[in-house]
């Protein structure tokens, strides 16, 4: 895929996308603002404790890759940063408000169910119902310039499948339920065969013993 982000780059871009919608009065963000956003505990998984230098390194890299741009002057005190990852004037990636909300939440929290995504993305976009969430996820998974989202195999004991963004490369699926059941079936079959052999050997020994007693 054209868009490849490290875990830290995904966190920085996710934070800028989030703040652009939820706190527009504070956007663009200063470097310190990005540090605070990256390390906040609410709506982050995993919770990070990045230093200013670590965040600054990510900001510099993303500016070089044209995913961010710096803003200065016109009343701004110091350099601030705004995202050019999507919906920028000359950028290729165009996303709807619903798509931005889901992508942002996935960038910030990793794999989640559609229900979790609807709840956690609510500050950015109010989905009418679960059908709209599922429809938007399907669109992201089937875009010609994507896919940007993948549905993961349902984990054992879980009622719902989770979704994950693909901006950090392919996602390794957890073992599917059917795969695990097949593995269990194979193990049971091997144990049954071993027991059958053991029973056959015991039967032979019993027959031999009875024959000996008969003599």
From Swiss-Prot:
Source organism superkingdom: Bacteria
Modification type N6-acetyllysine: residues: 80
Acetylation keyword on record: yes
Annotated Pfam families: DUF480
Keywords from the UniProt entry: Acetylation
rRNA-binding among keywords: no
Stated family: Belongs to the UPF0502 family.
The protein's name: UPF0502 protein YceH
The gene coding this protein: yceH
């Amino acid at each position: 895929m054209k868009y490849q982000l490290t875990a830290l780059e995904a966190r920085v871009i996710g934070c800028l996308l989030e703040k652009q919608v939820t706190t527009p009065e504070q956007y663009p963000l200063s470097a310190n603002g990005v540090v605070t956003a990256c390390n906040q505990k609410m709506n982050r998984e995993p919770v990070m404790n990045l230093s200013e230098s670590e965040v600054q390194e990510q900001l510099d890299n993303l500016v070089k890759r044209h995913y961010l741009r710096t803003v200065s002057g016109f009343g701004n005190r110091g350099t601030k940063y705004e995202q050019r990852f999507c919906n920028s004037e000359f950028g290729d990636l165009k996303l709807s408000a619903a798509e931005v909300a889901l992508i942002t939440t996935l960038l910030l929290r990793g794999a989640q169910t559609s229900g979790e995504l609807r709840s956690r993305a609510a500050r950015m976009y109010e989905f009418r119902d679960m059908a709209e969430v599922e429809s938007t996820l399907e669109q992201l998974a089937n875009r010609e310039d994507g896919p940007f989202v993948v549905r993961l195999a349902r984990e054992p004991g879980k009622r719902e499948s989770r979704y994950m963004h693909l901006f950090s490369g392919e996602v390794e699926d957890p073992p599917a339920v059917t795969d695990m059941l097949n593995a269990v079936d194979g193990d049971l079959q091997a144990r049954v065969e071993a027991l059958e052999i053991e029973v056959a050997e015991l039967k032979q020994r019993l027959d031999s013993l009875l024959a000996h007693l008969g003599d």
